[in-house]
């Protein structure tokens, strides 16, 4: 059925059957299309069709499941169009609604709901909110600690003394973190107990035979390979230099020693040889003909190797068996106590959930696992009867994004797949054994494997969620590519997304830096991406750009003097990079004039000008960087949106509302109270707040207000307040002297607060918050501020959070505030509300993780000079899923504390795994680009850094693994790989690098390395400041009183510039401004255009809000932008589209009333609507900028002087569409029409510039121009 031309490899992935099939699909390889096609071929097979509900398809997200279901539905529908009588197709279309295409969590929930009777859970269970779970966990751990303190549990007390700080919160954090970590293990109690038992060693313990010892040896061998390269490089220099051949023998001995170590497989031998080795002394011969530079160079290299070997000796010397044994024996009680403490906590937390009939997200997988597994008499984990039923039911189990599976999910999938074998614990680790097991009931078709797994281990970036890429890698290394095998793999590495320039660059870089050590996979030619996309020859691809700037660049005194600034005023590093990126974007986009980048539009099937929406800025993390980048881009007039997960709780409107809720709960909190008092909710001035505080400095601010309130109201003070008042007469005098307006203000606020406190008890929290929005007018006030739409959206999010909270098992304002605080600190804040649609023409800033699965014409990867986050390595107890616990050794009696030897091993292992994850994250970032890739980063001391890069270029094919292991930033990897590339020659010359490179790589990838000048960016900042300062000076002079200098000041200020008229010409005009200018030229009396400005109340203070004509026009334009004409056959369809905009909060219900479905339908059924429907190229709300002569607008200017003056016209075209013989331009108008000719004259000039913009941007002829008038439901053609 599919018209797609599949590659041979794709066909293998689609049609191979009767085996376990692993599909390794590189970035852009079309894995989703292949997976969908495989399903379609299965259900429409003419020989043995499989009903779609007999397939289990597991996806990573709900969106992916929905997309897959939609694609399959489209394919079936297309088949029915071709064969309407097909019973098979009709059946599959019916079964599609109950198909098992879902996320792993959805499948687990299905299993639980169908088999709840086998578990001790209520069938009406609810999945608890994440923050509700956090609150319950905190309750559980507080209660558990209190109980253990009360009974004075000795193990617990020792644990607190060893691993808690002054408070026990640090130990609580350890327990909560270990609990979360353990839940990624299939049988978490077993894992916890096994990891503690690793410390329970006897006299026979031999560290040299443990996995830890092997790990130390393998890690050190990576470094030794680096030392080997350095020594080999030195020997090459000795043999090719004059007069230093006497160095050859000692260097050869050193190299033999390193080679011998690399061949060792026994830790004991390895350790012994390193400790025993003494470097031979270098001969002290003097040879006047010796090449001194070469001699010094090899000595330096050898000294470096010697120093590193001494460090390894010292480390290995500490790994003495008896010492390690004593450490283990000492730590065992604490580690056992820790495991037991986590188990006790889990049981208490489970009890709390059961009381409320709740389960959390971890429970979903673990409950499913317990339903699907049994243990046989030998203790092996085998499928339960329920799992066997699923094995019979599912003809095939298909798993998407397999590289992101964790071990719990892997065991679950193995239980419902037809695989031979069982799971069992070996040395504390759960492992799969592919052996025959005896099942009481013979398994149907067990001999025919039925598992399909697709993913890309190079894109496994969710280790922080306990994803285990080793699951994929183990199969990838074991499975065969040969046909007919039971376990087979297929490789899809042809990339159908990116230009060859992007692919070649990605391949070059990762061949240089990715390995089994860092990245967990060797990036060989076999693993490399292959070019599959065709972009034609019309527009040539561009090289990948690397834009670097030295953040420690010293600014000379001359420069500081020239620009009159202090060095401290220089832009900070993030600002610098943000400004650099803004400049790159400006150059890429241009002003829709000449010079902008052209990109291929898949929908149009042709090249067009680059738009802002085509660009994404990717960052490793957006929390601190994105807001600064947004500011820098906005300064350059670049529309931008940052998709962040932070900043929400720092917005003024949310801080104010949370402060209000805090004082309603408890007004005796000075900081939130003052926040509310200074806000528009209460509007107290600083002077008024000082007057209130003067009542008494020793009590809370609210108590001061309460005293004023009571005395002013002639109420008697109770004993509590009397206690704090030493001199009541003095207080009375203060209050008597107080401004009457202030006293009334205080009384009004106190009374409101008391009313709010009372009301908060009687209504749900979500209703109460909305009541406060309306009662205080704060929601309306926020909307009237700059970025009001965003602020109101943030307030709605708080309301939604309250609604979510109201459904939990917690009630009341106090608990809601705790709920918000836990959300703030445990979930790492949240991003502000999203108010932009997917098609808005803005540059997007997002994290690399959020970009996974997406693609963009232009990708800018920024922040590559930022250090990797290794803060987790500093915790006092580390956890590793395979190696277990890595605690500090803490002896409270002797007051000794240091990292245990096993902690150092685990710390290094986690560091390597983190670096591997960072490597894959970098791969994901670079493979998002379709046509253009730009990398930006700041370097600390450019000259030294580049010199270090050059020293790592001895191997042209690979950056040394030890160098990659020691990398702290992405640039530490990218730099050494690129510095030896042929395209780096000019960059090295620019830096005056004299070192000769013998290993220049002549690779087909194309790179452009730019060194950006910090001085130029500093200059721009100074120029901005000069404008601001001149405005302030002008303002100061305007306020000068009469003085002896009046005449001189007047004379200087009255100076008239020769081209003064030009200064009044704006550099940019909107089309509306142009229209007004032409009307002004025609009217002698401008009174109608510029009426007296009348101040009016903000909308939120008015009793009734009426939508203005301009707002009405905006709403209708917004609806027309989002109108889908294909789904607008009747008024009900129109209403449904209106409701969708309301749901997505693009418009409110009140605003929706101005959209008349009947009028919209008339447009859709009219001639223009039909023509739009028939067009294959329809564009809406297209912004533009075009350059025109200033004389064209300002005809009064001197033609000779201003003949070369230009200005930019900006506007937004409502709609244009393409027909065979040209473009059709359409502009919507909601004005009331008296005279058709008047309307034509009014908008003629506007349409003229729209036409000119379209001509320039598209290069195509505009054949027709129309105004559609909604007031009369008709259109006017503009000649």
Swiss-Prot record:
Catalytic reaction annotation: Couples ATP hydrolysis with the unwinding of duplex DNA by translocating in the 3'-5' direction; ATP + H2O = ADP + phosphate + H(+)
Domain UvrD-like helicase ATP-binding residue range list: 4-499
Origin superkingdom: Bacteria
GO biological process, alphabetically ordered: double-strand break repair via homologous recombination; recombinational repair
Record-listed ATP binding positions: 25-32
Residue span(s) of domain UvrD-like helicase C-terminal: 526-853
EC number: 3.1.-.-, 5.6.2.4
A single MF term (Gene Ontology): ATP binding
Keywords: ATP-binding, DNA damage, DNA repair, DNA-binding, Exonuclease, Helicase, Hydrolase, Isomerase, Nuclease, Nucleotide-binding
Cofactor dependence: Mg(2+)
Cellular component terms per the entry's GO annotation: cytosol; DNA helicase complex
Similarity remark: Belongs to the helicase family. AddA subfamily.
Subunit structure: Heterodimer of AddA and AddB/RexB.
Role description: The heterodimer acts as both an ATP-dependent DNA helicase and an ATP-dependent, dual-direction single-stranded exonuclease. Recognizes the chi site generating a DNA molecule suitable for the initiation of homologous recombination. The AddA nuclease domain is required for chi fragment generation; this subunit has the helicase and 3' -> 5' nuclease activities.
Protein name, UniProt field: ATP-dependent helicase/nuclease subunit A
Organism: Clostridium botulinum (strain Hall / ATCC 3502 / NCTC 13319 / Type A)
Lineage: Bacteria, Bacillati, Bacillota, Clostridia, Eubacteriales
